[in-house]
Amino acid sequence: MCDHHDRNPNHNNLNRRSLLRGTAAASVAAAAVVAGHGAAQAQTSPLYADPSEPALPASDVVIGQDNTALVVVDPLIDFLSPKGVAWGVVGESVTEHKTVENIGRLFKAAKKAGLVVAVSPHYYYPTDHGWKFSGPLEKLMHAIGMFDRAGPLNLKGFDGSGADFMPEYKDLILDGKTIITSPHKVYGPSTNDLDLQLRKRGVDKVILAGMSANLCVQAHLYDLLERGYEVAVVRDATAAAKVPEGDGYHAALVNFRYVANALWTTDEAVRRIESV
């Protein structure tokens, strides 16, 4: 489905609209199954509450101005805006966690403190649709034109598209100082230049946020850990889909507790950034 699908814009728009209609209903149904109740506040939901008696030893990250970067994964319209193609399944989680607002707070705090700030975006070019095999979510993303761009050197139709940066952050990202890496293509940064950009600036500690929690954020976390970075994940500056297959945010949160060097709220992250 993703390899030779019709690239006609009208067909693609129809697919995007169909997904928004269909997945909105799936999101509501899945939320009821997974969470067991209606619109509970995310961070106070029993589903997301930290264990009262954790078995794993505590760890933390001590950040500094010269060795720490804020890395935001996929702060893009397709993930974070009601206009985006994924809103039908991620919108509830984004709203619960105040993800858009919290990512903005991190951007502003990091800029004010003089930290390195990097964005790792997800883009697909026409040549990427020639892949011969893909996983389930890759197939879906290709079929509905998620993160599609006209080409690596072609910005036609980019402004305001699903692949564009959220308008709330666009001025901060395009300030001439933010690192905008080459795009990652599946989930993690092994296919882009994030590691190079951070190492060249002496960064060995990362504050990680963005979308989607159980996909690209989690993949970035694992890759950065394997490369020797200390990583603090900001738990309410991310979100994930709720579908019949499961609650992506809950799945990610469990793994964040297992492997991240630290797991902070936005309030805590901002406080620490302001103190460097």
Predicted regions and their residues:
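Surface-exposed, active-site-proximal loop segments in enzymatic domains
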Residues: 82-91, 132-133, 224
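Short beta-strand segments at enzyme active-site cores
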Residues: 115-122, 234
